[in-house]
């Protein structure tokens, strides 16, 4: 199939960007979205143009490195799918596709479609861990964890840190990402001693980094490739406010 | 042949390997190792390249011990290292099930699984430490699967006869890596780790023969910079991407260890490559990488191809009598659960016979119809739902309706830099951990053992052994002006400039694809003398063309993904040649290395313990590599021919 | 704010690192627990939720009080008078009303302040807009919270001038409450002037009630649907209850 792409091009963080139109031909429906961009890039190089920079690594939906806003939706319209897993069979011949980078002040554009998401690392560094030195752990069976808690903690722990939640949120809020980690650790017995401190430090760090606040709009969970539920945000709020969370 | 492709040097020995009763060796070594005074640890700096399971766990633990750590990764966050993609699980000899597992059995299985090409002492230590890994990870909050009683669940994996594999749904690597990443985050916050994401190591700095630092390129600004330390740890992962198509992440590369190899570190067993049988087949020329489908699918799926070649009917239209369930036919006792290398080769054989299915005839069916009929659709969905979904996303076909198509793909590289029992390479002060070293797995790795090894190295082994070396430090302070430092940095700048200056007519990817094709055809699942000789010639010619005709767009002082690629490919060329030479010299079949000339009458791999019971450690010379042999002895596990019939 | 290249800049030098600075910040936060909490977006949202809930409480009582118009002129006027005498002699005349007015003003001020601060924070977080932005699942109600709130506030000002003070009322300041009310709603355009903000209020609460539960950590995957259903039901009942009086007047049930 043949497609028209409008791609955000920006030489570096300080220069002004703009949308540039490209036409790509003979795209196979079996290609992934990124493979389609590979094809375009190969052509751009041979034409002496600068290929489009975009982040990616695992190309199987787990590393969280890829992420493009495709026709206005982070990771594209297919639900629970990362950009690298999105395949061209979901597009039609003749379609126009607009491709933009994540937009948020704490995610400055580095080049073209590449943004700097290190703010997420700062949030985890603020407290997204259990302080346990190596080698001092009790036997793994010393503390049983009810299956239900373990499973819910796991659901939250599957966050890949891609940042689509921020990109989608009209407030540019990192709440879903932050809440996913707070929920993961807060539900396990191992995470209890630091639970209150963790929530406070992580939430405040997110604010300081310039993310917006959550007004419970729910776009984040809709685009989240791992379907992290809004319940995690409720749990984060409860932990932050020092209230006992209810529900799962 | 020796003179044609390589030379033979003096044999080497693992000087740090303790002797005595195997179960006490690790204790003995730890006791014999020198300790570093706590006050001195603050004055010592360690560089850790890589933030995967191995590098992440090592950096966190070293920082905790008090060393100053500098960490590097090429991704935008340490959390994205390729370990994140591991699906199946991690082995540990916990024997929580009481099904007869023990440290000794894990040791035994690993030595046997490695086809008797690994060191007994190392493997025993790995099995011992495995137990502590699970404790450590659980304490960090890694959400392993649990049973209703709240205790950890385990499963049997990769044909093991005991249930020793701990898992976190199909995302074990992710959860373990996040555990290590969080431990790192804690140390970054505490100011003990200086993290450098989007920074690639491009050379090793040697001063007076010791590893004293790395030269890096900042992938955003292009700045080439020196970083100094008292010891350097490489944890840069595997090099399966030399095949272009593999299950590895796109950025996986050999650069870090290859640069160290060029500076004198021996490279061991480069040819041992694990080909995983259950991957989604290539769908066209555009294919950029291959996706693994967890091995656990073979527990319930049945593998088959049409009985006769050229059968293009839809799978549902092929009657039972005209199907060949070839694994069940050839290996009646293990059936669909034969080890990876056997399943992979069998698939290749039926496809070579022209009986493969799907585009290009490179695929076999993995059929769940029986399982669905037997267990019900819901039960199958509960077990494999996420994998089916992943398959559906990629292929657009629903495995509930039509059989999956699978084909083998390059997955893991057992080879890597040679290290001694302390995980130190032949360059003093250079330590290598995780998939980047060659240790522990011999000629073939068992499922769920790579995660175990990475974490064993990083959390428990290296932090103990590196002290023995560092006790002699701190070493003299260095600066950019030091002649050996300046030379290293200059070499990096020159190389970057050279890549950009070629300005030819072919893209880096086109070279990489072609190189991968050569490797897959001649150094892939089956290797022959003639094929390997041909491959060496082809690789040399292609490499020469690369340096004459590659077109790297852009400049060096910016984010330039083509430049990154080109640099990695340049190193892959050199590695590829060494892999072929290693494969050529090893005229036996063992583990992940199958030589067409060395098989039993019924087509199974035939080892030659008499001649090849050694680690092949190669020295870089710039011309023909020099082979150093480290002989292997087996006191506890008697080498035997594997049989899965 | 993060500047360019932060991803590659060394996170910190080991001795004067940002990591250290951050640790200090989190351990050395000054001020009482409540004020520290309020600094974060989550704290602001909690304030909005609590103030919102209090305002909802007022509206429920107000709505029920309004239904007295159906009991006749005297009953309604008595009720209005009672509001001014309740609590006497413990409270001065209209004491209760003034307490309520001050209370509501403070509550509204807090609610609006937090709303404005959150809006500013959100605008700063997304300085560059998308060229194309598609909504995936956000509701109309959730998107109209800010403008809806402003319109509701404007309405309240008008409403007080109309029915409490009387200057904006067709019947004027001298008329009794019942007369003013009837004077209003005999005019269809004033019914519309009330109905529109009321519908917006309904939307505000449809999202607000669920949102408040979420903000206070009362959400949960299993509860999301029930709470949302309740919120919708509640908003419908409240708006309908308020609309009874104007519609009653318009169709002539109340004269
Ligand atoms: C799809 C898949 C599934 C797997 N499933 C399993 C499983 O179920 N069980 C199991 O035991 N094993 C599994 N494995 C194998 C296992 O995941 C890997 O062997 C293991 O994770 C390697 O860890 P590592 O820490 O050595 O390296 P990696 O995780 O690969 O990390 C390498 C690190 O080095 C950095 N790096 C690399 N080069 C440079 C450079 N030049 N400069 C700076 N930094 C650099 C990278 O940024 C990265 O941080 C699987 C592998 C794959 C591909
Ligand atoms: C000037 C007037 C008002 C403004 C500007 C305003 C604005 C807002 C905003 C921006 C929100 C947050 C949006 C969200 O949660 O998605 C909100 C929430 C809310 N508002 Fe209002 N509002 C106003 C008046 C009112 C009134 C009169 C009521 C009560 C009846 C009310 C009840 C609520 C409730 C219950 C919430 C939910 C709180 C939460 O999400 O935590 N608001 N309002
Ligand atoms: C049709 C709907 C409504 C009717 C008929 C109505 C009627 C009245 C009347 C008659 C009064 C004057 C009472 C008195 O002075 O004794 C009043 C006061 C008031 N109403 Fe309403 N009202 C309606 C809707 C609303 C709404 C939607 C709000 C808020 C969002 C609101 C907020 C107030 C306030 C704040 C006062 C002032 C109370 C005081 O004097 O302190 N009303 N209303
Ligand atoms: S919560 Fe979802 S969208 Fe946000 S970073 Fe995690 S995986 Fe991505
Ligand atoms: S979209 Fe934004 S407002 Fe909250 S619920 Fe999600 S973070
Ligand atoms: S590239 Fe790893 S998630 Fe898309």
Model-derived segments and spans:
Chain A
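Short, contiguous acidic and Ser/Thr-rich linear segments
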Residues: 20-32
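Glycine-rich phosphate/adenylate-binding loop and adjacent beta-alpha elements
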Residues: 70-92, 99
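Eukaryote-biased recognition of intrinsically disordered, low-complexity regulatory segments
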Residues: 1-22
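Ferredoxin-type iron-sulfur electron-transfer modules in oxidoreductases and energy-metabolism complexes
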Residues: 31-50, 95-248
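Short strand-turn-strand beta-turns centered on an Asx-Gly dipeptide
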Residues: 8, 24-25, 70-72
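Short, structured protein-protein interaction patches enriched in aromatics and acidic/basic residues
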Residues: 53-65
